C-alpha cells in the first residue's frame, strides 16, 4: 500500500509540473503575440518596450540591442513602411522560447516575406531575438506555398 501511495504522489507531482510548464509556455506565447502586434503592426514603440526585459539582445545584424534599438527599428517602419502588416501564421512555445512563422508585407499588393522569429523570455519578458527572413518568390519550384 505505501508503494502505491508513493507512486500516486509521484504521478501527481509530474502532472502538476507539466501543467505549470504548459501554463508558462502559453503565457510566453501570449506575451510575444501581444508584443508583435504593438511593435510590428501598430508600430507603438512605447507600448512595445514594456514587453522587454532589462537587457534585450538582438541577433539580427541590422538591428541594435536594447530598448533604444527596438525603438529605432519601429521608427524606421513608421517612416519607410507605414502600411506594413505582419500576419502570424504559427506560434510555437518551448520552455522560455517562442517561435513565430510570419507573413510580412511591407507594402500593399506585394508578395512580402516569410519570417521565422525566435524569442527568448525570462520572467515573462522578452530578452533575446533571432530571425530568418526570406522573400516570397514570384515563381517557386513547387506548389506547396511558404505558409
PLM regions with names:
Residues 1-5:
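Positively charged n-region of N-terminal signal peptides that target proteins for export
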Residues 6-16:
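Bacterial N-terminal signal peptides
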Residues 18-147:
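C-terminal and inter-domain tail/linker signature
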